[in-house]
Regions:
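Conserved AMP-binding A3 loop
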Residues: 35-39, 165, 172-196
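Conserved pre-ATP/AMP-binding loop-to-beta segment of ANL
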Residues: 22-24, 136, 157-176, 183, ...
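Conserved AMP-binding/adenylate-forming core of the ANL superfamily
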Residues: 22-70, 74-78, 95-100, 152-153
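ANL superfamily adenylate-forming
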Residues: 30, 34, 116-168, 278
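Conserved AMP-binding/adenylation subdomain of ANL enzymes
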Residues: 195-216, 221-262, 277-278
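Gly/Ser/Thr-rich phosphate-binding loop
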Residues: 261-266, 276-337, 349
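AMP-binding/adenylate-forming catalytic core of the ANL superfamily
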Residues: 94, 111-113, 257, 264, ...
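Conserved helix-loop-beta element of the AMP-binding
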Residues: 107-109, 126-138, 212-215, 241, ...
Length: 514
């Protein structure tokens, strides 16, 4: 890809010229279980671009997408890029009031929504003064809700338009990031960022190949999922298995058996659940996975080691962000050190700084800053937040890390999750990692809580494995003391049914502090 061209030329149109038109690009594992070849994607995305033109869409107008993982997602995303418009994929798990806020904030002129999501989305569209059309992706010919247009009718008889010219530095798409606090921010990315992540993590770490079959637990609308399931496989002409449902362990096992993915992209909570289920079943799983990736939260050492024993392949754990589009700090295949986030991905640089922006020494905790080719242009309508996050070439992540003597980076927690006990920093993640190594514990979250003297101490919330009884509190406290130190052990152990999480599986510790 020429860094000064529309990303759709490289990721879609190029495959026709290189003879991959008949190869399957996307295969649905649920719903209608359809397939979409590279050739058909090129045609249908060009037709969607034509439909946008027909509806008066101009360059850089936003096309909001509340679309589950299904064939139409890549058609709409790449079709919008071909037309010079800006696709804005939204989390499909949000509430109506959040959708309303985002639709108003983005000023989207066209909304494309899956029919299964319409009842939640409908209130968000009422009274919207920016939308010119609401397009519902319907699975049959039974009709669509009043005031909307079916996807089939929207694109019917539309001409297949040629991909518009665009510079690599032109805005291409937005992703709304809520982080762990739930306040949506529009993160603006340019055309060249997609190939930048494919060339760095996709090619040089993951080693994505044309003969790979990829399955990503993270959905398309996440930055992590967009790379895993779309830009990485499409950069080499591979095939992606898409699943719009909830990725339960049983669903994951079914996909492994039926669709035989070679690359599996998950998140720590899902890996933990799948490992626990396989251990419950006994034996080894049926699979064809050559490599797995994890992001969203730091992967606990215990989970990585148990997975590798069962699956016989590594989980390459790393850290990325919506602002950087994908993973920029990662372990490497054949060199995975569980409990660390590895080393900078080729093409990226990182720093650890203190509260005065001075570099910290080896073993000291500092905030992680990153710079590289996929950094966002900033937030939409969030000038102050943009200025405090994007500082010149460097992007603040809000993550606290320390560096080992071997140069590897160890996650300590979010800036607002860290706390001091007796004047010493405590990493919630370190305590949580010790807790889940205690027999019977599936998940754990640690937050600060004042004791009777109003001194801050660690408090733990734990989820037990199915069929396991609550642990003896003193036994688990003693276990953690022995593993990581006297001042770090949790003074309170609360057993809960589940932990609050974001849609990406990140633990929302702020809800436990409230």
């Amino acid at each position: 890809m020429d860094q000064n061209e529309n990303a759709a030329l490289y990721f879609v149109d190029r495959h026709i010229a290189e003879g991959r038109g008949g190869k399957v690009a996307f295969r649905e594992a649920d719903g209608q279980k359809r397939e979409l070849t590279y050739g058909k994607l090129a045609e249908e995305s060009a037709r969607f671009a034509g439909a946008l033109y027909r509806h008066g869409v101009r360059r850089e107008e936003r096309i909001a997408m509340i679309v589950r993982d299904q064939i139409e997602f890549p058609v709409v995303f790449w079709g919008a890029l071909k037309a010079g418009a800006i696709p804005v994929p939204l989390n499909t798990l949000l509430a109506s009031d959040i959708y309303e806020a985002i639709l108003n904030d983005s000023r989207a002129s066209i909304l494309v929504v899956s029919e299964e999501l319409w009842e939640v989305v409908k209130p968000a569209t009422e009274g919207n003064r920016f939308l010119r059309a609401v397009v519902v992706i319907d699975s049959d010919e039974s009709g669509v809700p009043e005031g909307t247009e079916s996807f089939c009718e929207f694109v019917k008889d539309a001409p297949q338009e040629a991909t518009v010219e665009a510079y690599g530095d032109e805005l291409a798409f937005w992703l709304y990031s809520s982080g762990s606090t739930g306040v949506p921010k529009g993160v603006r990315h340019v055309h060249s960022s997609l190939k930048a992540t494919a060339d760095t993590f996709g090619a040089q770490v993951l080693g994505i190949r044309e003969d790979d079959v990829v399955y990503s637990v993270a959905k398309f609308f996440f930055a992590y999922g967009l790379g895993n399931a779309m830009s990485f496989p499409m950069s080499v002409g591979a095939t992606t298995v898409i699943f719009g449902g909830r990725p339960t362990p049983d669903a994951v096992f079914d996909i492994m058996r039926e669709h035989k993915p070679t690359v599996f992209c998950g998140v720590p909570t899902l890996f933990a659940a799948v490992v626990a289920e396989q251990e419950k079943k006994g034996g080894k799983p049926e699979h064809t996975i050559r490599i797995s990736t994890s992001a969203g939260e730091a992967l606990p050492r215990d989970i990585g080691e148990r997975w590798e024993r069962l699956w016989g392949s590594e989980i390459v754990d790393g850290v990325g962000s919506t602002e950087m589009l994908h993973i920029f700090l990662s372990n490497r295949p054949g060199d995975c050190v569980y409990g660390t986030s590895g080393l900078p991905v080729p093409g990226y640089e990182v720093r650890l700084v203190d509260e005065h922006d001075e570099d910290v020494g080896e073993g000291d905790v500092g905030e992680l800053l990153v710079r590289g080719p996929s950094s966002a242009e900033g937030y939409w309508n969030r000038r102050h937040k943009s200025q405090s996050t994007f500082e010149g070439h460097w992007t603040r992540t809000g993550d606290k890390y320390e560096r080992t003597p071997q140069g590897r980076f160890v996650y300590c927690g979010r800036t607002d999750d860290m706390f001091k006990v007796s004047g010493i920093w405590v990493s919630p993640f370190e305590v949580e990692q010790a807790l889940i190594e205690f027999p019977g514990v599936l998940e754990a979250a640690v937050v600060a809580r004042p004791d009777e003297k109003d001194l801050v101490k660690p408090a733990a919330y734990v989820v037990m494995k199915p069929g396991e009884t609550a642990p003896d509190p003193q036994a688990i406290k003693d276990y953690v003391k022995d593993k990581i130190g006297m001042w770090k052990y949790p003074r309170w152990i609360d057993v809960v049914d589940e932990l609050p999480k974001t849609a990406t599986g990140k633990i929302q510790r702020f809800k436990l502090r409230d």
